Amino acid sequence: MGPGEALLAGLLVMVLAVALLSNALVLLCCAYSAELRTRASGVLLVNLSLGHLLLAALDMPFTLLGVMRGRTPSAPGACQVIGFLDTFLASNAALSVAALSADQWLAVGFPLRYAGRLRPRYAGLLLGCAWGQSLAFSGAALGCSWLGYSSAFASCSLRLPPEPERPRFAAFTATLHAVGFVLPLAVLCLTSLQVHRVARRHCQRMDTVTMKALALLADLHPSVRQRCLIQQKRRRHRATRKIGIAIATFLICFAPYVMTRLAELVPFVTVNAQWGILSKCLTYSKAVADPFTYSLLRRPFRQVLAGMVHRLLKRTPRPASTHDSSLDVAGMVHQLLKRTPRPASTHNGSVDTENDSCLQQTH
């Protein structure tokens, strides 16, 4: 294993560890909070995080072994099963992101009718369609024996068949990426554009109210006025930043792998192994980006995490420090000294006799 493969293996280990931890946190938050579970977006997020968790636990270790050893798993039939999971989970993740973007558009564009338009039951039906579509493509690839170890990507996934089957395989690959990449990207862009329009209208209304309030409050302190203007600028760019991050992560993670897969179909193109492994690692990094983009950085999940940490800290007993133990010992000694009578000294006795004699003389 050369230095390039060692760097890619280290990158894959980091992606695997962060993906396991972040997606497990999302599932733990949804299991802890009943409010998150009953939302339609919560059902979609559970499906997305569960798929990423399975990808990190079952698929990424085999790719790591392929990078380190450069060969297929020794167990018979294991590579076909891992390739089936890889195709299914990648397609399911892309379609789940499209469903989440549609859910966000309905929540922002139709806030009063959102609960009736997309209930958890309808979200389950939507996920059933996504699962059925992903299973159809994975089952077709498994039935045609197109799943196996690909040395260009060091993973168990789709591999090039012999020359007579290349046209069918090319049509299947183009259809798979059209449904699993182009369609979710189009849905993501269209719904994000609608969300951005609604957010821009809301920002314009809030800016009008803010400017009128600043014009009426003439004696307002300049620092407060400047703070209001800064918040106004942040409010304008907040929706654009969130939408841009969602689209950019989707493109950065999926586009290199999809383009490499399509270029692999050209007869005179040979895929470099290091580039193929890097593009595969980028697809795995979507399992790291999605929990932070759609879950952990949002306010409901932050509140649930804070509540879980607070409850955990309340249950754990505090270890007694040396300062507290010294105070306890001092208190015990003080109570003991208060209970024991003090012996009268000779000096105090002489002073008492002198006081008694002085009192008798005055009387």
Curated annotation (Swiss-Prot):
Membrane topology: Multi-pass membrane protein
Chain's gene name: GPR78
One CC-aspect GO term: plasma membrane
UniProt keyword ATP-binding, yes or no: no
Cytoplasmic compartment segments: 29-47, 102-122, 190-242, 298-363
PANTHER family registered for this protein in UniProt: G-PROTEIN COUPLED RECEPTOR, G-PROTEIN COUPLED RECEPTOR 78
Protein keywords: Cell membrane, Disulfide bond, G-protein coupled receptor, Membrane, Receptor, Transducer, Transmembrane, Transmembrane helix
Highest taxon in the source lineage: Eukaryota
Subcellular location: Cell membrane
Disulfide partners: 79-156
Protein name stated in the entry: G-protein coupled receptor 78
Bias-annotated ranges (Polar residues): 343-363
Stretches that traverse the bilayer: 8-28, 48-68, 81-101, 123-143, 169-189, 243-263, 278-297
Region of interest: Disordered: 340-363
Gene3D superfamilies: Rhodopsin 7-helix transmembrane proteins
The family this protein is said to belong to: Belongs to the G-protein coupled receptor 1 family.
Pfam families per record: 7tm_1 (PF00001)
Residue intervals annotated with topology Extracellular: 1-7, 69-80, 144-168, 264-277
